[in-house]
Structures are given as C-alpha cells and as structure tokens.
Amino acid sequence: MASAAIYYHPEAYSIGGPKLMGRNAAGESFLRGFLLHTNTSEYWVQVEQQVHAQTFAATRKQLGQAHPVKVVDKNSLGALSQPGVIYYPGPGIGEHAWHRAAFGHGAYSLCGITHTTSSAGAMDSIAALISAPVQAWDAVICTSTAVKTHVEKLLQAQANYLVDRLGLQKLVLPLLPVIPLGIHTQDFVFNATQKTAARKTIDADKDTLVVLFMGRLSFHAKAHPLAMYQALEKAAQLNPSKKIVLVECGWFANDFIEKAYQSAAKLSCPSVRVVTLDGREAQNRTVAWASADVFCSLSDNLQETFGIVPIEAMAAGIPVVVSDWDGYKDTVRDGVDGFRIPTTMPGPGLGGDLALRHALEIDTYDMYCGHTCSFISVDVEATAIAFNQLFSSPELRKKMGEAGMERAREVYDWAAIIPQYEKLWDEQNEIRKAQGGSLKPLANPWPARMDPFTAFSHYPTKLLNADTKLTLNDDSLETSINLLNDYRALAMVNFAKLVLPSEDECQAILNALNRSTLSAGDIIQSVPAERHAFVFRALNWLLKIGILKVVT
C-alpha cells in the first residue's frame, strides 16, 4: 500500500499558535495519526524552509521513530515523482498543479483536503480546480458528505460560467472521496478517579447534570449559543429538582465576545450555572471531558464542514445533542449516539447581498459568517426535549454514550482512517500510471461567488418557503414584543443589525400573527412589495431567536 510525501509547514500541524483554529487541531491530529499508523518505512516531506524539515524530524522523534526523512523543496519538486503522491493540508491543489506542470502533468499526483469551504480563499481555491491543470489522478478529500456537496456546487457553478464564457467542452476534475477526520480515541478515555476529580474541580456533585460545549466561543463564526441557552432553561424548568451546570470550554477572541456570552446566558438561562474554562489549556480540556454527562454543539455556521468535537465526546462515552447540520449529519446517528436537532435556513436567492459584501471585502469573513448565521435557526423546543430525555434517564445516557464510544473507536480512530488515505493514494498512482499523458491546460477565470443560501441549501433539515406555517412562540403579543426587544438588545444579536428587519417591520409581522397562524408567503404581505424578500428572510431570524415557531 502506497504512502505519500507530506507538505509540511509547522503552522498547519500545530495547536501552539496564537490563533487556534479547527484546521490546526485537525492537522496536528492527522500528522500524529499518520506517523503512528502508516505502512510506509520511507518518509518524504516537502517544505518551504529547511528548518521546517528539522521540525518534522523532531516531531517524529517524539513518537519514537528514527527512519530517515527525504526532503523536497521548490528547487527539487521533480523528486516528488519518487513517492508519487504529495499530500497538502488544504483544498488549494490548483496552485500546486501549476507548479507540477513544469515537470509534466503525469509526474506525480496531488492530494488535498477540505477544511472550511465558505471563506473567499477556500472558494477561490476550489473554483480554481477547474481552470488549473488538475488531473483525474489528483484528489481533494472531502471530510463530510455535506462539504462534498458544497464543493460540487462550486465546481458546477464555475463550469457553467466557463461554458457560457468560453464554450468549455472538456472538464477534468479531481477525485472527491469522502474520508472523515480522525481522532485518537484513547485520548478521551477517563477512569472513575479522573471523573470524580474533574467534577470536584467544577463543584458538581454526583447528582448534578453537567452539559458541555467544547470549542471556540464564537457566536458569529462557530455556534451561536442562544438556542442552547434557551433549551437548557426549558429543560431546567422541566427538572426543577435537578442542578444543571453548563461548561463552556473554549476561548474568546476578545472581551466583547466574552461579555456578549455572559449577558446572553444571564438573560436566557438564569436557572443554569455556567462554568467557563480556557480550552487552550490541556488540563481544562481534561476536566471538561471527564466531568460531562451530556455534550451539546448546535452549530449553525457555514464555516463548519465536519465538526470533530462531537466525535471526541462520543469517544469519551458522552451522549451528544447536536444540530442537524453539515458534517454532523454523517457522524452522529440520531437516536443512537445522541440527538440531531432540526435546523432551518432561508432558501436559495436570499443571500446574494451577503455574498457580494464578502466578495467586495465590505464585510470581513467573520462578519460574513455572522451575517449568514443570523438567519439559520436551530429548533429550541426539540433541543429542550432531547435534554429532558437525557436528564431524566441515566440509562439512556449510558446507552447512547456506549454506542457513541463504539462508533468512535471503530469508524473515527486514526487507526481506521489512515488506511483509507493510503488506499486513495494507491488509486491515484494507478490512475496516473494508466492515463498519465500530456493534457491541455484550461483558461484561468476569476472564481465564483455564490449566494450562501444557495450554496449551503443542503445543510439544514428544511428550508423556509412560502407555504411554511408560522405563529408566535408565545400566545401574548405583548410578551412577544418585549422578548423581541430584549433579544435585539443582546450584543450577539444586535451585531448583525445591518441585515435585520426594522422595528416597524417586526411589529407588522407580530401584528399579523397575533392569535393566528399564517404562511410565510401571507405574512410578508403586511410590508411593502419591495421589502418582501428582505422580510421573508427575516422570518428565519425571528425563528432563530425564538419569537416565532413553525406549525406542523
């Protein structure tokens, strides 16, 4: 079974940097998994600087490996024909295909991998795969079915443009296999002594229910916590005799975001004690994993593509409550490992302005993520029901935790994942050797930008449409108005005020639904025609913050 040369830059494979992101954690975990589970005895590495090769060798030495490393740099790219495949820790293999062209398109194969696919840079690199000299023996690993669908949408949109612009008749695409990220499941096994000590650290006795969120604490770019807070409060009201603790183990980018979390939790889940741990510290992560009874991640963000943390929770034997969103659809079996909660998003055609603001750099990527996630809702009632089921049944928690642990070990441990990588690399070599002739390069157009609600329309459980029946979540119009005003005042809601409906428009919506149930198409008749699309989209924002609910 073949292995591959590894394109190595320390930043891509380390969690020690100043701005820890999911791709860093995934890269570090992959490298460790590769070094521990590869079948090769000959290591190749491509570097930009020789010092990086020394860092790679030191990493291997820490794992007890002493095999020599063969180093390739920009002055010796042709040597990559010896390992036959080069693995890059990102999707942008188009740039490297141009580098390869000097040595012949069939000199070696390229293999990349997706992380987020919603940023301008990621979409540019994916769209560029069509115009760059990428070949049928190249591959971009998609970490989930959801991200593969988005990659295919981007590629199709770019191909359509080239057909219209240049009369494109020939299309050569890389392989797009779905191979999930892996974890080291043994890292998440804790004994009874560790669990007792961890719960003592957060002042949780054996009868306290500990719910854990693990990851970046970023309402605009990771998982907006308002739905989780609201659902926990509902569950707390259903279990008045139980003490509930929410552990948020992560890190805030700044004081503004930290204060936004604090004010939202104070308003939305006053019955729940919130403990915040700095997730950049390994000891805090151990405390979080070892103390938790239930894990929750209600991701509602376009930048999420796989979501490794629920699998880590499963490896720790913790039942999970997650949104029915992106990669979670693949990893978490609803009703088996935990619960997947329905999500709703506006349909295609309602986000072109958001895409354009991002494309023209009026909005930063963070603001683009925040604006789009403002219109993506997670079903609070279903979340509360899931919490209540788990809170009420230690047996269910144990059953789901054990099922998740078994799945994590059998499906998502690197011992099971690395052989899938090496099988792919074998396939790439076989295709290249059979088909490796010279091919004409395609033209190089500027990449596409898509309406986010078109590009990601497959992420949610359902799409809001004109026939969707809506009503007020509270029977009282006055209460609904007061709640809306309270939520609008929250920093984590108000930050997106530029794309939210006016107070008059909100009042018109609430008045229309006072003591009645209407379709979304009928509701927007209460505002001027030129505002129909804007207000239609805003109905999903009102669903998101719990003012409206869907009537089924």
For each of these PLM feature ranges, what is it?
Residues 51-133, 549:
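Extended catalytic core of nucleotide-activated donor transferases of GT-like folds
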Residues 1-83:
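N-terminal pre-catalytic "stem/leader" segment of glycosyltransferase-like enzymes
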Residues 146, 182:
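Carbohydrate-associated surface elements
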Residues 279-282, 287-292:
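Short alpha-helical donor nucleotide-sugar binding micro-motif in glycosyltransferases
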Residues 184-280, 448:
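Conserved catalytic-core segment of nucleotide-activated headgroup transferases in glycan assembly
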Residues 358-512, 519-522:
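C-terminal amphipathic helix plus adjacent low-complexity
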Residues 319-322, 332, 339-340:
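Short hydrophobic beta-strand element within catalytic cores of glycosyltransferases
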Residues 290-305, 318:
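Acidic donor-binding loop of glycosyltransferase active sites
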